């Protein structure tokens, strides 16, 4: 069997490659480049990011040391079309985008996966922390590193051709394997920031794309102006540090793109127990009305809920109020370790 592995240049995918090769599979590594190298020249990278020129250097050395062929794939145009354009549009609409969720669907396990299959690859692998069992997506055993939230966008029929070798291991175990195997990136830092905003300067990035960021009013829930924001792209639902003094702790409760305004309120005002979800990706066979738990952010606590499909939208009713349900973010549904499905939060009901 021929396995194509997404080799990022980091320790996780390097160890995944190492494990699969030791199991005797024929391996071909693929390293994707989402931005041109010159894009990074005049940017000071604050934290480790993926898909940088240094990652390409590391990926080449990992593949060479392992004795497997490596294909470097330039995905600049499709990445701009599917991810960057979407990211810009969502923020200008006052929503909070989730580019990693869509990158997994459209780029890594979409466009690139199709290219790999055209090359004759039978199975696709990566260093993600998750599991695929009998065609179902499951959480990783290491719940702190679990990445099933971002992988829940993958189309159901593609899961049967995907394997995640790291899903049953902890990060410490992965680093230990890498160190013992002499893999040079065994202590490499994890990626933290967006690959297309390596310096973390959102304002600069938007203005480079021709979108001017404007300041605007901040209103309390009664309509009284209490301050000025620095541009809607700098805020998300539930954010507390907004630079105003309101006499009490306040949070962003609404982002009004049509008025270029923020609405703030107290903690109770930013809690919701009913919301709608669009672009639902169902990963298991289940009735259109079902019970599950839901996560509305990568690091949020799962909350029990009832889910129903109504007029091509999923309506979610949680058993308790959920903090900071942000339109544009992914809502991912679970039963135990199994991912039931996922979609994009449309609005609070």
From Swiss-Prot:
Q: What is this protein called?
A: tRNA-specific 2-thiouridylase MnmA
Q: Where is the signal peptide?
A: none
Q: Which UniProt keywords apply?
A: ATP-binding, Cytoplasm, Disulfide bond, Nucleotide-binding, RNA-binding, Transferase, tRNA processing, tRNA-binding
Q: Which cysteines are joined by disulfide bonds?
A: 103-195
Q: Catalytic positions?
A: 103, 195
> Site annotated as Interaction with tRNA: where?
128, 329
Tell me which SUPFAM superfamilies the record gives.
Answer: Adenine nucleotide alpha hydrolases-like (SSF52402)
- Residues folding into a coiled coil are none
Gene name for this UniProt entry: mnmA
Highest taxon in the source lineage: Bacteria
Q: Which family does it belong to?
A: Belongs to the MnmA/TRMU family.
* A GO BP annotation: tRNA wobble position uridine thiolation
Q: Where is this region: Interaction with tRNA?
A: 145-147
EC nos: 2.8.1.13
One GO cellular component assignment for this chain's record is: cytoplasm
Q: Which HAMAP family match?
A: tRNA_thiouridyl_MnmA
Q: Which reaction does it catalyse?
A: S-sulfanyl-L-cysteinyl-[protein] + uridine(34) in tRNA + AH2 + ATP = 2-thiouridine(34) in tRNA + L-cysteinyl-[protein] + A + AMP + diphosphate + H(+)
């Amino acid at each position: 069997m021929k396995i194509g592995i997404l080799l990022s240049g980091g320790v996780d995918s390097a160890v995944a490659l190492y494990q699969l090769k030791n199991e005797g599979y024929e391996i071909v590594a693929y390293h994707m480049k989402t931005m041109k190298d010159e894009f990074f020249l005049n940017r000071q990278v604050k934290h480790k990011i993926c898909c940088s020129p240094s990652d390409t250097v590391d990926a080449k050395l990992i593949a060479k040391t392992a004795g497997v062929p490596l294909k470097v794939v330039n995905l600049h145009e499709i990445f701009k079309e599917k991810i960057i354009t979407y990211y810009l549009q969502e923020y200008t609409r006052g929503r909070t985008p989730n580019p990693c969720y869509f990158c997994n669907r459209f780029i890594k396990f979409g466009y690139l996966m199709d290219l790999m299959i055209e090359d004759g690859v039978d199975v696709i692998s990566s260093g993600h922390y998750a599991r695929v069992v009998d065609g179902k997506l499951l959480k990783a055993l290491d719940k702190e590193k679990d990445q099933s939230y971002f992988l829940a966008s993958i189309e159901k029929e593609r899961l049967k051709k995907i394997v995640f070798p790291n899903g049953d291991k902890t990060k410490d175990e992965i680093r230990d394997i890498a160190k013992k195997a002499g893999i040079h990136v065994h202590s490499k830092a994890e990626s933290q920031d967006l690959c297309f905003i390596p310096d973390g300067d959102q304002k600069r990035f938007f203005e480079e794309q021709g979108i001017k960021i404007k300041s605007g009013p901040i209103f309390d829930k009664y309509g009284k102006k209490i301050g000025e924001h620095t541009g809607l792209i700098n805020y998300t639902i539930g954010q507390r540090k907004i630079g105003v003094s309101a006499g009490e702790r306040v949070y962003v409760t609404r982002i009004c793109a049509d008025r270029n305004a923020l609405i703030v309120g107290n903690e109770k005002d930013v809690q919701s127990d009913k919301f709608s979800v669009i672009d639902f990706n169902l990963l298991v066979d289940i009735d259109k009305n079902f019970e599950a738990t839901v996560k509305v952010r990568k690091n949020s606590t799962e909350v029990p809920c009832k889910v129903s499909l109504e007029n091509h939208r999923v309506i979610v009713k949680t058993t308790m109020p959920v903090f900071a349900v942000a339109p544009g973010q992914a809502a991912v549904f679970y039963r135990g370790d199994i991912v039931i499905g996922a979609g994009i939060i449309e609005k609070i009901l």
